[in-house]
Amino acid sequence: MKSLPFPSPSRDLAGDSAQSLLLAARLHAPGSYLGIHSVPGGELVRVFQPYMSRVWLQTSSGFQVMECTHDAGIFEWKGEAVTRPYLLRLEHAETGVIEERYDPYAFPVQISGHDLYLFNEGRLLQAYHMLGTHQVKNQGVTGTRFAVWAPNAERVSVVGDFNHWDGRVCPMMARDHSGVWELFIPDLPGGTLYKYEIRNHSTGEILLKTDPYATRYELRPNNAALTPVESRYEWQDNDWMVQRAGWDWLHAPVNIYELHVGSWKRHPDGSFYSYQELADHLIPYLQEMGYSHVELLPISEHPLDESWGYQVTGYFAATSRYGNPEAFMYFVDKCHQAGIGVILDWVPAHFPQDSFSLARFDGTALYEHEDPRLGYHQDWGTYIFNYGRSEVKSFLLSSAHYWLSVFHIDGLRVDAVASMLYLDYSRKEGEWLPNRFGGRENLDAIDFLRELNTMVHGEFSGALTFAEESTSWPAVSRPTYLGGLGFSMKWNMGWMNDTLNYMQLDPIHRHYHHNELTFNQLYAYTENFILPLSHDEVVHGKKSLLDKMSGDVWQMFANLRLLFTYQMTCPGKKINFMGNEFAQGREWRVNHELDWYLLERDPHRGIQMLLRNLNHLYLDTPALHELDFFTEGFSWIDCHDSEQSVISYQRRARDGSFMLVILNFTPVPRTGYRVGVPESRTYQEVFNSDSTYYGGSNIGNPGDIVPTGQQWSGQVDSIIITLPPLAGIILI
């Protein structure tokens, strides 16, 4: 941003009151006392340097000694007009070392009134350019501009090693009535640790806070922010970004590998892979396995590993656990060059109570609601954002914008949307407050989500948004101009719950629960659904996918193969959590890598091979993905064979090509099974989950399958096939 015109020298307010407030670290307007001031006969320069024994001021006549007017470290000089900005020569009291530096109070503020206005209105979508820290030039001098929002503060200071963490030394300038504080500190190198010391105006409480807009933090358990280093990363993903802008994602295959960076793989000593190492190892694996995207569990900075990243303290920073921001850029860039999209799990629903971060940031409920019935999440022990506060809206929208813009992220998965939409979410009667109409809908959250999706789709062509929404809220993935929330897709939690419940049943009981396989088609096209088998289903005693399956060991693996066949052929885009693809035996453990040694065993290698083949079949076959969101892409052949627990359906592409899917959910091989077909021609089996390659019994249908000439199940013809046990087959 361009500097504002330098203000005229202020009237000297060097009374006892201002001096006392400075020394007590309570001075609200440091520019009224420090810096240059007009006095009779010229100008006065006043600095506060409590750790210096002597101070000189550079004038047109050279360096002049400044008079120490208070033994706490106040130095003054009076004379004719001083050239701005002016340089100070400082002698350290402890060491005698002499250094030269510019006075922060010799520089004008830089943030424009227009940006402050937009921020206060909730319409500043790139607030990260204004707030936080930035390496800038001010009056030709390079330095760091600090800016933070703390409207209920009496005083805000930048503190760090460079000023002995002394809140008296670098108090910030209050920017009118915006609640924003700003200070330019010259010659501060990138990578310098800092925090904000905030004194509440009403209570006098002093808080030490990290920067909400910082782009980098020190490694946990420490939590100071770091001043930025100029990024020199040169992106090489232009082809991907151009292609994405014209991407017809509604009709394209979307097959997502959900991954936690810290527990996918680790070094033998248990240390994390860096972002660069992850790129080098993960990308070839994703390509081999046939995934179109990788979705990262939250990599925004967070203090607690066991939160999986869902208790965020740094909404603009890639966690330093795995490297610096440029290293994460490298990861995204390499994914794009390999044709892999990158989706981030993003958490605008709540934030942790950690005292160093957003919670009661300036001594008041700033980012959260004051009333715990609105502002406290009982299940997670976290605070809920106040979406009705304009500056909070600017903060969250800017966070989303930052990841999509600066890091070229291809999509955001918004966590816990249901908890945002309902004021009574997980609350008993009397524990929540209704909206202004007396209802339980969070109107502010609804507006925020619509603005979020409007921004993403309007400014980042081809970028996607995913809602993890577990209720029947209507039109989650419908455009905002039609009254929807505007998400690209919604997680189909109903399909996931029904399917996993069904797969855990003993096959002898499954025919009583046949509707759990068929009910999904009654609502499958009310939203743009994605079918998840996610991290939430393999933790907290829920068991791994393999352990959920019923039967003996052979049947458990057969059931898992059948589950993946059903998922990959059912309408909807796909997402699978890491480890699912090779039948991880244990629940996911965040502090350990996956059990890769299982791939030494044939059944696990078989699952991996099956899912690899299914993934590539899905990517390469228009009938399995082009019409995922449209009724024309799916039709039942027979959904009524509950007695034998068999379902059959066809998937179609826009050009009319189709595939037939027949699934047998019992361990009984069925010979002579008649299936209706839409065309009187020969068919071939192109996939069989019971293949010996996958660990099955190799029962199937080799060669041509000839129609019988008999109509069946409302189809023009039929075929006679053999159905393998606990398996699915695909015919073309």
From Swiss-Prot:
The keyword Transferase applies. Gene3D superfamilies: Glycosidases, Golgi alpha-mannosidase II, Immunoglobulins. GO terms for biological process: glycogen biosynthetic process. InterPro entries: A-amylase/branching_C, Branching_enzy, GlgB, GlgB_N, GlgB_N_E_set_prok, Glyco_hydro_13_cat_dom, Glyco_hydro_13_N, Glyco_hydro_b. GO terms for molecular function: 1,4-alpha-glucan branching enzyme activity; cation binding; hydrolase activity, hydrolyzing O-glycosyl compounds. Belongs to the glycosyl hydrolase 13 family. GlgB subfamily. This is 1,4-alpha-glucan branching enzyme GlgB. It comes from Nitrosomonas eutropha (strain DSM 101675 / C91 / Nm57). The lineage of its organism: Bacteria, Pseudomonadati, Pseudomonadota, Betaproteobacteria, Nitrosomonadales. The gene is glgB.
